[in-house]
Swiss-Prot record:
UniProt key word RNA-binding: no
Location of the AB hydrolase-1 domain: 26-268
Family according to the record: Belongs to the AB hydrolase superfamily.
The organism's place on the tree of life at top rank: Bacteria
Keyword rRNA-binding: no
InterPro entries assigned to the protein according to its UniProt record, in alphabetical order: AB_hydrolase_1, AB_hydrolase_fold, Polyketide_trans_af380
Keywords from the UniProt entry: Plasmid
Protein name: Uncharacterized 31.7 kDa protein in traX-finO intergenic region
Disulfide cysteine pairs (residue numbers): none
Length: 286
């Protein structure tokens, strides 16, 4: 395969993998999760898809990795714009069959693929793994009514302060993504990838709270495969099942790795099985 790096006019850094052969290839754009960068977790999937005959693109959202933009600013609507910017660039590449563009998303990116597909008919196929359906339920679902009211009041006060003063609190990623799985993962990777050791606005919690990928999934008509991990404590499998139920497309499947945790899917036997299932889905529907 041929691997090249590019920087788009929007400031988005991407890596473009193309299989051997002078033909127009179908394309899979891989969309990362919460504060993810393209060199972490994604290459194994990108390489597997490219070896199977698909061109692939991995990229950094604006504000993360090698892309331009305010460091750590995570806004789902902006990240969806980034996906569409990548589609715009990709369809102009001579080696790409622009009638066969698919999206693959993981975790938060597994929600973004629905947001993008709902806005852009060029998306012909989706794989979404380890995603959530409703950010409000995800963030506040285990709170009682009093705890939820207090939590939302605190967020609203912080948002008002930002509006009035322009100042806001920035925290480490694991202050927001605070489950034990994520704490272990981010502690492990930030030594190898210092660009993962960033501060993000605490109000990112509010962005997550207001994000409901299921609403976009209800507008999507292209084939959809949803992958869940049965032991996922980041985005519990019930969220993935709710997302599956919301998908409007008549061509949809739900695949579960019952014994896997959130970060298990990227390596070992779990990865091998999931990548094979996803590759077959793209071969059939893209």
């Amino acid at each position: 395969m041929k691997i090249t790096d590019h920087k788009l006019s929007e400031g988005i850094a991407l890596t473009f993998r193309v299989p051997e052969g002078n033909i127009k290839h179908p394309l899979i754009i891989l969309c990362h999760g919460f504060c993810g960068i393209r060199n972490v977790l994604l290459p194994c999937f990108a390489n597997a898809f490219t070896e199977a005959g698909f061109a692939t693109i991995t990229f950094d959202y604006r504000g993360f990795g090698e892309s331009d933009g305010e460091r750590g600013r995570l806004v789902p609507a902006m990240q969806t714009e980034d996906i569409i910017s990548v589609i715009n660039w990709a369809e102009k590449q001579e080696c790409i069959d622009n009638q066969r563009i698919g999206l693959w998303g993981t975790s938060l990116g597994g929600g973004h693929v629905f947001s993008a597909a709902a806005q852009d008919q060029r998306v012909k196929c989706i794989v979404s793994q380890l995603a959530f359906a409703d950010g409000d339920v995800l963030v506040t679902g285990e709170m009682n009514e009093s705890e939820r009211a207090s939590f939302l009041s605190t967020l609203n006060k912080m948002a008002e302060k930002k509006k009035n003063t322009g100042k806001e609190m920035f925290v480490g990623v694991t202050r927001v993504l605070s489950d034990n799985e994520s704490k272990v993962f981010f502690e492990k990777v930030k030594g190898q990838y210092p660009e993962m050791d960033i501060k993000i606005p605490f109000l990112t919690v509010m962005e997550t709270l207001q994000y409901k990928p299921a609403e976009s999934a209800a507008k999507v008509q292209c084939p959809v495969l949803i992958v869940i991990a049965g032991q996922d404590s980041v985005n519990p499998p019930e969220q993935g099942k709710a997302l599956y139920d919301a998908v409007a497309s008549g061509t949809k499947e739900l695949y579960e790795e019952a014994d896997a945790c959130h970060y298990d899917i990227y390596e070992g036997a779990f990865f091998e099985r999931v990548a094979a299932v996803q590759t077959q889905w793209f071969k059939k529907h893209l």
